[in-house]
Amino acid sequence: VAAEQRHDGTWRDGAWRGAWATSPQYPTAPFGPNWSQQGFSNHTIRQVVRVTTGGTRARIELSNRYGTKPLRITGATVARTDKGASVKAGSVRQLSFGKGRSVTIPAGASTYSDGVPFTVGALESLTVTLYLAEETGPATFHTFSSATSYRADGDHRSDRNGTAFTESSDSWYYLSGVEVSGGQAPRRDGIVTFGDSITDGVGSGPNANNRYPDELAERFAAAGKPRGVVNHGIAGNQVTNDWAWAGEKGVERFKKDVLTEPNVRTVIVLEGINDIGGSGPSIPGQSPTPEVSVEQIVEGHRELIRQAHAKGLRIVGATLTPIKDSAYDSTVNEAKRDAVNHWIRTSGAYDAVVDFDRVVADPGHPDRMLPAYDSGDHLHPNDAGYRAMAQALDLDAL
């Protein structure tokens, strides 16, 4: 995969802070229907996101990282969310790109809108609407949004009500970031959460913002010190292997998804369970990937640490959570998980460690997730489990 280039030729300046983000993925449909492979033509997409920090100006990032041809964005708006696909009266703001209403993003690239005056508070939901008049081809997207996106035929970018948006999807399309500026002196205190489906929030309730990074942002806001907490988890992602439906391997996408975020101080890494459970024999519906050793996973983590330290970032390692009775459960896999966790806890390679394994484990059966925290598949936490994970993080240390 070619390295992503910024279409507008600019780099983020010191005034912008990441308020929301997601990691772009290759157009696939491994978990059920979505719109990524068919793309769009004369469609309006409306997407709802919750920002973790506030400001007085906003801009969005759009990605055509995995597009097969240039992507024409005919127009875009941002507004305050009302209910569903509806937005609040008087809140719609037209976005521009280099002072024009439209923009063409080359295949493999991304771009930012111009900043627009838009006062928004921490934990407030925004609605971003894109009008795509021309055929797009397959769409760069993010599979698991745990949020509803909406589609309408024709141009409805400025509609206040959601009547025209008769179709819905549980993925995000093209939208990869929301940044804010103003409202506070610039400071480098942002947090990136990086990982797989447990960071992505699989198992949490829809449209509830109960992923562990969401819960962490709520804790900061409740403590009176809101800050940007952005989520770069991809369900199924591995440290060491590319999967077409689960993103580039962590050691590669870290450069694109984490190291380009503005004003970040700390990265939290929770990744490796798919290297263990997804390697070797094929899981139904998935292609097999090479067998991955403990040593390879550890070396992948060391590479993430090297990349973070080279950019002056503090990096926190999280232990891998229980797999007993899940699709990944085996004696071999449990031994690998234990070995990786032992290294994370004792090596001193990470600047700090958060022991998510012990947070969500059943004290009486530590290889198993506590039933009260189990989403039902014995691998992913539920809302209560994600809340417990966020509570385990020391705000002052972060």
Question: Where do the protein language model's features map onto the residues?
Answer:
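N-terminal secretory targeting modules
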Residues: 1-194, 204-206
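Conserved SGNH/GDSL esterase-like catalytic core that processes O-acyl groups on lipids
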Residues: 20, 41-47, 70, 74-79, ...
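Surface-exposed amphipathic alpha-helices with a cationic face
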Residues: 301-309
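Non-membrane alpha-helical structural segments and their capping/turn regions in soluble enzymes
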Residues: 248, 291-302, 334, 338, ...
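Catalytic His-Asp segment of secreted/periplasmic serine-dependent ester chemistry enzymes
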Residues: 238, 277, 284, 320-398
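Active-site-proximal beta-strand/loop segments in catalytic clefts of secreted hydrolases
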Residues: 63, 131, 194-197, 231-237, ...
